[in-house]
């Protein structure tokens, strides 16, 4: 939870090394489709164009994340190029008017009190307001914020999630998109898709089938088709940045290898005294 200025200051210390480790976890803006406004795909699409992705990543995310707008982590063979969404207030206003909200509406935006979450929420609040969506920020602890999401009792939320122990498209899709049972009684709280009320049986089937596909080229094509359909459905969860872990290591530490799934083994790590060669 260090500030960007703190990370940059540590980079200038000759006794330290700062490693940037790209994770598969996504920072996102989530909407609850249990809430009437966001059940409307035109409203969700309006929100898509009321996020300053480029500005947020340039100003707020150095040391925390890099611009990424797909549910599958960057750099994998199956990952499609970013769709290139940008802040477009005029387009968002038109969509809101078509949805029946020409003057916008009031809502709430939940967010952790930690950085960079809070600064992201403030930035999103500002651009939502330009189209008449007045989002009151509710900040708190993980239990308060993600707890409300697990209970499906929220409007908008800035959060982070996805990926898994292994770098595979299914890990990301299972965490962020998959929702096999959208009923309240299912209580599938591990699935962000269930938390947001986003449900598409065809997409679920595509995800199941892609995992079992044995031909590597066909599997890549399957995962790309999933991303295309997900985008076309105007989902309730909008990825905006892929997480970067900034790991600070003193120069006397040897054999420390940061891991993208936070599973670094410490058994081979050791420290040398000043003047010794390691």
Language-model region placement:
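Bilobed periplasmic-binding protein-like "clamshell/Venus-flytrap" ligand-binding domains
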Residues: 58, 98-116, 156-166, 211-251
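Periplasmic binding protein-like
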Residues: 127-185, 230, 236
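A ligand-binding cleft/hinge motif common to bilobed small-molecule-binding domains
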Residues: 3-13, 163-169
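Short, solvent-exposed loop/beta-turn-alpha elements that line the ligand-binding surface or hinge
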Residues: 9-21, 30-40, 74-91, 101, ...
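Extracytoplasmic
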Residues: 13, 24-26, 104, 235
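Ligand-site clamp/hinge motif
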Residues: 1-10, 125-126, 134-136
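Append "and occasionally in soluble cytosolic enzymes with long acidic Gly/Pro-rich linkers
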Residues: 39-126, 130-131, 197-206, 214-216, ...
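Short beta-strand-to-loop elements that line the ligand-binding cleft
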Residues: 1, 20, 109-111, 134-141
């Amino acid at each position: 939870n260090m500030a960007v200025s703190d990370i940059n200051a540590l980079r200038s210390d000759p006794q330290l090394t700062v490693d940037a480790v790209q994770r598969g976890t996504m920072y996102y803006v989530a909407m609850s489709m249990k809430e009437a406004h966001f059940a409307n795909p035109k409203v969700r699409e309006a929100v898509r164009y009321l996020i300053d992705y480029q500005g947020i990543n340039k100003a707020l995310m150095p040391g925390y994340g890099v611009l990424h707008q797909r549910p599958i982590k960057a750099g994998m063979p199956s990952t499609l190029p970013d769709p290139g969404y940008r802040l477009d207030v005029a387009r968002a206003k038109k969509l809101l008017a078509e949805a029946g909200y020409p003057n916008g509406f009031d809502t709430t935006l939940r967010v952790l009190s930690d950085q960079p979450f809070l600064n992201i929420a403030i930035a999103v609040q500002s651009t939502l307001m330009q189209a008449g969506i007045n989002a009151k920020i509710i900040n708190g602890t993980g239990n308060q914020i993600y707890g409300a999401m697990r209970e499906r009792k929220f409007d908008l939320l800035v959060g982070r999630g996805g990926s898994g122990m292994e770098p595979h498209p299914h890990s990301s899709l299972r965490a962020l998109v998959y929702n096999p049972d959208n009923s309240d009684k299912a209580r599938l709280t591990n699935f962000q898709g269930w938390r947001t009320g986003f449900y598409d049986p065809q997409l679920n089937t595509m995800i199941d089938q892609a995992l079992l596909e044995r031909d590597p080229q066909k599997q890549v094509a399957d995962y790309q088709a999933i991303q295309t359909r997900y985008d076309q459905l105007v989902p309730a969860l909008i990825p905006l940045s892929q997480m970067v872990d900034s790991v600070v290591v003193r120069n006397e530490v040897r054999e420390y290898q940061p891991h993208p799934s936070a599973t670094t083994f410490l058994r081979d790590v050791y420290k040398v005294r000043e003047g010794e060669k390691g």
